[in-house]
Amino acid sequence: MPELPEVETVARSLAPQLLSRTIVGLAKLDWPRMLTPPPPEFAALVAGRRIEAVGRRAKWLLLTLDAGWTLAIHLRMSGHLLVAEPAAADAPHVHFALDLDDGRRLIFDDQRKFGRVHLLDSTGLLALDAAHGPEPLTDDFTPAVLAERLRNRQAPIKALLLDQRLIAGIGNIYANEALWLAGIHPLTPGGTLTVDQIAALHHAIRLVLADAIANQGSSLRNYRDGYGRRGNYQEHFNVYDRVGKPCPRCQTAIERIVVAQRSTFFCPLCQVLVQ
């Protein structure tokens, strides 16, 4: 699933293609369940709306429209967005497309049909924002904020990092990578981290996410940016999906366990679980 770096990369690549464009109308929809509100209402509300900003909140891509509306798009497992010529919408896994006033289309290709497109008013946007924790790359996300988020929590730190209500945008890939960089075992109860460990984890989260954005995200399967380009960060993984391979720090074989129903990779020497 695209995480913060991938969605941020998509937003940055779509912005120059979409800013100031007007949505002419709904061009294609063959999977109505992906839309909120229902298709007839959705189509009527987006027609003629001007795209004023392209941004991100957590793992949601946000297209700010005039008249107080926002298109909130979640790519889920296999979705990707492109601005392309109209014929591109005929591809077999394109389930949603919007006509733009420059003759092109914003198309949503989603092989597994898990993606979602929500048209939100100001109240809906506030609710989406409130459902997520702080953005980890903002100045407001400090070690003290991280410590407060983890206070008294006995769940494994890996599971807590995946909880979007606590911290926004971190998914399985970057939780694994940040914990390795910080030298913290993924099963460590979040509320037991020391001040030094919290500082190390805070630094690691920000560094890993920033590096991933600089490399246009990670392309393991379907992920592409708004121009159809693959990311490169998968070439820089230290532990993710590297079971049995040597740890870049100490050469110990990387191990795999399951935490919060997700594959979890760590170095048993660099990331010791303190009982």
From Swiss-Prot:
Keywords: DNA damage, DNA repair, DNA-binding, Glycosidase, Hydrolase, Lyase, Metal-binding, Multifunctional enzyme, Zinc, Zinc-finger. The keyword Ribonucleoprotein does not apply. Its cofactor is Zn(2+). Binds 1 zinc ion per subunit. PROSITE patterns: FPG_CAT, ZF_FPG_2. InterPro entries: DNA_glyclase/AP_lyase_DNA-bd, Formamido-pyr_DNA_Glyclase, FPG_cat, MutM-like_N-ter, Ribosomal_uS13-like_H2TH, Znf_DNA_glyclase/AP_lyase, Znf_FPG/IleRS. A zinc finger (FPG-type) spans 238-272. SMART domains: Fapy_DNA_glyco, H2TH. DNA binds at residues 93, 112, 153. GO terms for biological process: base-excision repair. Pfam families: Fapy_DNA_glyco, H2TH, zf-FPG_IleRS. The active site is at residues 2-3, 59, 262. Signal peptide: none annotated. It catalyses: Hydrolysis of DNA containing ring-opened 7-methylguanine residues, releasing 2,6-diamino-4-hydroxy-5-(N-methyl)formamidopyrimidine; 2'-deoxyribonucleotide-(2'-deoxyribose 5'-phosphate)-2'-deoxyribonucleotide-DNA = a 3'-end 2'-deoxyribonucleotide-(2,3-dehydro-2,3-deoxyribose 5'-phosphate)-DNA + a 5'-end 5'-phospho-2'-deoxyribonucleoside-DNA + H(+). GO terms for molecular function: 8-oxo-7,8-dihydroguanine DNA N-glycosylase activity; class I DNA-(apurinic or apyrimidinic site) endonuclease activity; damaged DNA binding; zinc ion binding. NCBIfam families: fpg (TIGR00577), PRK01103.1 (NF002211). Belongs to the FPG family. Monomer. Involved in base excision repair of DNA damaged by oxidation or by mutagenic agents. Acts as a DNA glycosylase that recognizes and removes damaged bases. Has a preference for oxidized purines, such as 7,8-dihydro-8-oxoguanine (8-oxoG). Has AP (apurinic/apyrimidinic) lyase activity and introduces nicks in the DNA strand. Cleaves the DNA backbone by beta-delta elimination to generate a single-strand break at the site of the removed base with both 3'- and 5'-phosphates. This is Formamidopyrimidine-DNA glycosylase. It comes from Chloroflexus aggregans (strain MD-66 / DSM 9485). The gene is mutM.
